[in-house]
Amino acid sequence: LLKDETLINCYNDFSKNLDKYDSLVTVQYAKKHAWFNNKPINYDLKNTPNSQDLTPIMFPTFNVMICKTSSLLETKNVMTENCLFYQVEDNEAIEIDDQLEFDVAEFLYNRFKNENK
């Protein structure tokens, strides 16, 4: 569900910043109560905020990945220390790992296709 303009913008932003960044990865931000090892990691359990008041957590979507060849060969990873994170809209960040996610993506695709007629 990635838009053409997002691909173009990613390429242009990375190209303009080759002196600063080795790679670009698309990301989305979420305000969710996150836990690890049975403990909250982004809030105090004694003072649980509403989710809309949480600091957004960034998640790579890997919809678009751009990396300098030299950096990729050196790190063997598209996410480098000098990575440009490009935020995409939630509907562009849909991941398809199972049937339910495929059904959601198909529904959204058809909805956006019909809206753009």
Would you name each region that the model predicts?
Residues 1-89:
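Conserved core of the sugar-phosphate nucleotidyltransferase
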Residues 74, 86-87, 91-117:
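Hydrophobic helical membrane-anchoring modules
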